From Swiss-Prot:
The gene is atpA1. It catalyses: ATP + H2O + 4 H(+)(in) = ADP + phosphate + 5 H(+)(out). ATP binds at residues 169-176. The record marks 373 as: Required for activity. This is ATP synthase subunit alpha 1.
Length: 513
C-alpha cells in the first residue's frame, strides 16, 4: 500500500492533534546541603514561610529562611538518609494537625500521629498549627473559675477560664506536679485538658500518662509529646500543635485547659534552629523574635464571646462562650526570674505562681511564695465563698514571714505578736497539701473558715493535719446536703455562714482528732 504525501501529512496532523502528555506544574528544588537537621534548597521559587516541603521517603521539612537564591528548611524528624542533589517539592500547604474529640485519651506526637499503640485516630477535622489569636472585640472578660484543687492557689492566686497563669520555679520544686493536679481536678468540671511535654525524658512523660490514667483524667485529656530525643523542630512546634487541639474546643463553645511543660525548653529548641539557620543572635544567644515566639502562642489562650462561637460554628452553637486557659511552665536557674525568657513570659501572662526551692526543702508543698505570686485577672473569677473567706490568708502569711524574721533576734515577744506568729504558722501548715489529692470547693472553704474564724487557736500544730482530715470526714457524714450545695453553687450568705459555724463547733465538741 502506497501513501501519497497528502495522506502522510494528514496522518501526522491527526497524530499531533490527538497527542496528549499528562503534565503537572510542580514547585521543585534541589538539596544543596544537609547539616544538623537543616537543609538548604536551591529552587522552590514560590515557597511560603512555614510551608511544608515534601522530602524523599514521605518525610517533611518546614521552610523557615527564604533567601534570594535558596531556602533554609528544618527537617521534621530523622535526616540521616538525606543527601545533596535530592529533589524536594513544595506542597503549598501550611502544617496542619488532626483535632477533635477523637484525640481525647490519646498520646500523640507534634504532628498529631498516635504514639500510644492504641491504633489510628479516626478524625476528619484538621487545623493549622499557626492561627491568629482572637481580636479584642471577639473576647470576653474572664469571670468563671478554674479550680486547681490547691488551697494555696484557689484562695490566694485564683485562675479564671481564659487566663494565662505562669508556673515558674527552679527544677524539682513541684511545677509539673501542680499542673498535673490541676488537670486531674478537671475530670468532673467539664473542662477538657491538653498536656504538652516539651524536651522531657520519655520515662518522665510515661509516668505522667500513667498517673493521669490512674486518677481517671486521661479520658478527658490529650497528651502531646516532643521528648528530648526528638528533633528540635518538633520541640519548637509542639506547643502550637497542642494549642490548635485546645482551640477546637474553645471555638465550639467548650472550655479547655492547656499546660505547656515547659516553654524554657521550647525557647532553647528555637534558639538551636535559629543559630543553625545563621540568624543573628541577641541576648543569651536567643534570636530577636523569641518574645514573639511565646506571645503569639499565649495570646491564643482566651475567653471568646457568644458571637464568635456562633459565627465560627455557622450558627450551630448559640449563646455559649468558649475558653482556653493556659498554664505555661518556665524553669529558672538558681531562682533568677530576671533572665531573658522568664521576664518575657511574666510580661505576657496574666500572673505567675512562683515556687521556691527553700519552701520546698522546708516541707512546705506546694512551695508557693505568696509574696511574689499574683493573679492579675483571676479575682473576678474566684468562687464567691472562697473569695469571701480567703481575704486574710495572704495578709496572715505575709505578716508571719515578716514577724518570723524579727522573732529570731528577739526572745521577749508581746502576746499579740505571739498570737500572730502562731496564727501564721498554722495557716502555713494548713496550706500544705499532698500530691494527687485535689480538694473540692467545700473542702477548701471549711478548712479556710476554721483558720479565719479562730477555731484553730487551741489545736496543736502537730495535730493540724489530723484535725483537717477528721473535720472533712465529719462534714461529709453530717452535712452531705451542704457539701453538695457549696460544690455546685459556691454561694455564701448568712444562712450558710450559720451552718458553717454550727458544723465546726459541733465537730470541735466531739474532740475526735
Amino acid at each position: 500500500m502506497q501513501l501519497n504525501s497528502t495522506e502522510i501529512s494528514a496522518l501526522i496532523k491527526q497524530r499531533i492533534e490527538k497527542f496528549n502528555v499528562a503534565s503537572e506544574a510542580r514547585n521543585e528544588g534541589t538539596i544543596v546541603s544537609v547539616s544538623d537537621g537543616i537543609i538548604r534548597i536551591h529552587g522552590l521559587a514560590d515557597v511560603m514561610q512555614g510551608e511544608m516541603i515534601e522530602l524523599p521517603g514521605g518525610r517533611f521539612a518546614l521552610a523557615l529562611n527564604l533567601e534570594r537564591d535558596s531556602v533554609g528548611a528544618v527537617v521534621m524528624g530523622p535526616y540521616a538518609n538525606l543527601q545533596e542533589g535530592m529533589k524536594v517539592t513544595g506542597t503549598g500547604r501550611i502544617l496542619e494537625v488532626p483535632v477533635g474529640p477523637a484525640l481525647l485519651g490519646r498520646v500523640v506526637n507534634t504532628l498529631g500521629e498516635p504514639i500510644d499503640g492504641k491504633g489510628p485516630i479516626e478524625t476528619e477535622t484538621f487545623s493549622p498549627v499557626e492561627v491568629i489569636a482572637p481580636g479584642v472585640i471577639e473576647r470576653k472578660s474572664v469571670d468563671q473559675p478554674v479550680q486547681t484543687g490547691y488551697k494555696a492557689v484557689d484562695s490566694m492566686i485564683p485562675i479564671g477560664r481564659g487566663q494565662r497563669e505562669l508556673i515558674i520555679g527552679d527544677r524539682q520544686t513541684g511545677k509539673t506536679a501542680m499542673a498535673i493536679d490541676a488537670i486531674i481536678n478537671q475530670k468532673q468540671s467539664g473542662i477538657y485538658s491538653v498536656y504538652v511535654a516539651i524536651g522531657q525524658k520519655a520515662s518522665t512523660i510515661a509516668n505522667v500518662v500513667r498517673k493521669l490514667e490512674e486518677h481517671g483524667a486521661l479520658d478527658n485529656t490529650i497528651v502531646v509529646v516532643a521528648s528530648a530525643s526528638e528533633a528540635a523542630a518538633l520541640q519548637y512546634l509542639a506547643p502550637y500543635s497542642g494549642c490548635a487541639m485546645g482551640e477546637y474546643f474553645r471555638d465550639r463553645g467548650e472550655d479547655a485547659l492547656i499546660v505547656y511543660d515547659d516553654l524554657s525548653k521550647q525557647a532553647v529548641a528555637y534558639r538551636q534552629i535559629s543559630l543553625l539557620l545563621k540568624r543573628p543572635p541577641g541576648r543569651e544567644a536567643f534570636p530577636g523574635d523569641v518574645f514573639y515566639l511565646h506571645s503569639r502562642l499565649l495570646e491564643r489562650a482566651s475567653r471568646v464571646s457568644e458571637n464568635y462561637v456562633e459565627k465560627f460554628t455557622n450558627g450551630e452553637v448559640k449563646g455559649k462562650t468558649g475558653s482556653l486557659t493556659a498554664l505555661p511552665i518556665i524553669e529558672t536557674q538558681a531562682g533568677d526570674v530576671s533572665a531573658f525568657v522568664p521576664t518575657n513570659v511574666i510580661s505576657i501572662t496574666d500572673g505567675q505562681i512562683f515556687l521556691q526551692t527553700e519552701l520546698f526543702n522546708a516541707g512546705i508543698r506546694p512551695a508557693v511564695d505568696p509574696g511574689i505570686s499574683v493573679s492579675r485577672v483571676g479575682g473576678s473569677a474566684q468562687t464567691k465563698i472562697i473569695k469571701k473567706l480567703s481575704g486574710g490568708i495572704r495578709t496572715a502569711l505575709a505578716q508571719y514571714r515578716e514577724l518570723a524574721a524579727f522573732a529570731q533576734f528577739s526572745s521577749d515577744l508581746d502576746e499579740a505578736t505571739k498570737k500572730q506568729l502562731d496564727h501564721g504558722q498554722k495557716v502555713t501548715e494548713l496550706m500544705k497539701q499532698k500530691q494527687y489529692a485535689p480538694m473540692s470547693v467545700f473542702e477548701q472553704a471549711v478548712v479556710i473558715f476554721s483558720a479565719e474564724r479562730g477555731y484553730l487557736v487551741d489545736v496543736e500544730l502537730a495535730k493540724l493535719a489530723d484535725f483537717e482530715a477528721a473535720l472533712l470526714s465529719y462534714a461529709k457524714g453530717q452535712s452531705a446536703e451542704l457539701v453538695s450545695q457549696i460544690d455546685e453553687t459556691g454561694a455564701w450568705n448568712s444562712e450558710i455562714e450559720a451552718q458553717f459555724v454550727k458544723l465546726v463547733e459541733d465537730f470541735k465538741a466531739t474532740q475526735t482528732w
